[in-house]
């Protein structure tokens, strides 16, 4: 599985409010428990004052990520980038040195 940084920003205050309602509903209906085994969340940060957030996940594919994030896609700009943690970064640097 690959680690990814997901960054998102709501397009406006109305979309942020609607997204918040969707998040509460998802959470209260067991959303966390019904994530696929091929999707793990390591950290999640949301700055409510400006409608932006970031999370670091491990997933088997971008398809898995987009299936989970699809409901919010029209409400916010979402970017997904591969990333590494510190140990992975150090390991990669060591492998690429002569």
Q: What spans do the regions from the language model cover?
A:
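Conserved, structured core segments of small domains
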Residues: 1-98
């Amino acid at each position: 599985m690959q680690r990814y940084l997901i960054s998102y920003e709501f397009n406006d205050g109305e979309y942020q409010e609607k997204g918040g309602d969707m998040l509460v509903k998802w959470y209260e209906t067991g959303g966390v428990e019904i994530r696929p085994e091929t999707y793990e969340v390591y950290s999640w940060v949301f700055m409510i004052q400006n409608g932006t957030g970031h999370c670091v996940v491990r997933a088997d594919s971008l398809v898995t990520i987009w299936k989970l994030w699809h409901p919010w896609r029209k409400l916010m700009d979402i970017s997904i980038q591969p990333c590494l943690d510190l140990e992975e970064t150090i390991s990669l640097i060591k492998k690429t040195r002569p």
